[in-house]
């Protein structure tokens, strides 16, 4: 029956109404109920024939299912829309989101609940507002759709229409008494969303309906949001309409100019100077009441520059692009505050430009500053850390010197991030645990890349001690992957993933130097994964024993010298020798096998099924157990 259900689903998906009818012809009522309620899984989506037909706009199929087979309109599934995964979506939600008006009318006329919500509390009306379909929006509202239902983030239909730039939908919702001053969880209103996206007609419409100028949860007004996003026309409109004080007006102009200096999509150094100069003139407009800047202390990442405090100082750097770039970063940090989530992005962008121009020292200064800001704000930094591994690898590949203190600094931040991500994984909801675990494992791999890079860097004895301390600190936390792999397991495993943007030019696994360094810093040589495998069990399965003989040989020697038990058994009762996949690893292992009397005794106890639990000291129980 499952095979038939697949054909039924395919016919519904492709709009083949006659094929669908033929497949269901002369079937019993229970069979039909099963076939039309069967949830098919495809590409991460879970849907019934009705849901997929509605999603794809097949009105004839939908009509057949509703009128002839009386399929329930409230079936729910999981669908993908514009890169988003929507759980708990009905056929009506799908039809509204995909813009299939005829299907929407069919479903509503057959009793579909216009206010049914998905798992994230999204309604069919919200889906239509996202897509900008005014005809569907009007129809749903006329059929009692509630315009005030917000999603789980308290984001309303008006907000999503404002953000997506659907002016006609925004106007209609306002006419239907949608609240222009409703706030999302983040404290933002529809005016914030429209201003950020630069939809000036919607900003005008919202102002006409007396939308209030309020701060969001990050202390940002719509004016500041527009300035930070380089939306100059919106800034100028709000300055002409909004009743803002002199300081707010000046800071909006400064923030706008500063943002143009370091924005990938909107970079314009002429506008940077223009708006910074306008703001400076406003500061000095009234000679009796000059509004002085509260400048930040010099910051190393910004070349220890001090922000321009008068028109003459600003004019002096007019032709100096680099100085204007730094001025922009300083101004943004002063106005937005170091803890603002948006402060770090332009710093990272400017650092990337330096890296592209082979000015690595400047790049690293800026990225370290951004990393510290993000960690101070308790932001997820797995991408930032990986970025360092990439640029350090690029430098080594180009024979550029990497400074050991920089590696140590990033390793220290990496340990902190891994510790925080371990706590996130423990305390997160089941729905988000997969993503959190991905980030956490990514951080472990990045840490190993950084350790690998450190082995290829000139270090003083003091620098090496500092690096080793960070490695020790992480080993002490004993982080594990989903498979139970320790750092040592990952270091000896050819399946450990290596990032392919510069990093794989320098880093590879298994890695003898990384293995030795981890062992020197206290890694437990006999630690086991979820299958009971030690690092020795893993390395003897390496499938390049000839071409990479030195790596295989060095790692086996290092592990054995560090106390690896060559007779240790995993959960399948296999020793490393049993797990060897090549003659080379087998020979290498046999030459290192020096069986102690203690190991022989432990194996004899296990081989003869002698009861040893609670008969010998606890430490010896564990020792006998892994033999």
Curated annotation (Swiss-Prot):
Segments annotated as TPR repeats: 344-377
Pathway connected to this protein: Protein modification; protein ubiquitination
Site feature Cleavage, where: 342-343
Residues binding Zn(2+) 2, per UniProt: 186, 218
Location(s) in or outside the cell: Cytoplasm; Nucleus
Entry-linked InterPro entries: Ankyrin_rpt, Ankyrin_rpt-contain_sf
Bilayer-crossing regions: none
Record-level GO BP terms: apoptotic process; branching involved in prostate gland morphogenesis; epithelial cell maturation; epithelial cell maturation involved in prostate gland development; proteasome-mediated ubiquitin-dependent protein catabolic process; protein ubiquitination; regulation of DNA damage checkpoint; regulation of extrinsic apoptotic signaling pathway via death domain receptors
Principal subcellular localization: cytoplasm
Disruption phenotype: Abnormal glucose tolerance predominantly due to defective glucose-stimulated insulin secretion. Mice also show defects in prostate ductal morphogenesis and secretory protein expression.
Summary of activators and inhibitors of this protein: Activity of the CRL2(FEM1B) complex toward FNIP1 is inhibited by BEX family proteins (BEX1, BEX2, BEX3 and/or BEX4) in absence of reductive stress. Mechanistically, BEX proteins act as pseudosubstrate inhibitors that associate with FEM1B via zinc in absence of reductive stress, thereby preventing association between FEM1B and FNIP1.
Outcome recorded upon mutating residue 186 to S: Abolished ability to promote ubiquitination of reduced FNIP1
Self-association state and partner proteins as the record states: Component of a CRL2 E3 ubiquitin-protein ligase complex, also named ECS (Elongin BC-CUL2/5-SOCS-box protein) complex, composed of CUL2, Elongin BC (ELOB and ELOC), RBX1 and substrate-specific adapter FEM1B. Homooligomer. Interacts with PPM1F and PHTF1. Interacts with the death domain of FAS/TNFRSF6 and TNFRSF1A. Interacts with CHEK1. Interacts with NKX3-1.
Family: Belongs to the fem-1 family.
Record-given protein name: Protein fem-1 homolog B
Gene source species: Mus musculus (Mouse)
Lineage of origin: Eukaryota, Metazoa, Chordata, Craniata, Vertebrata
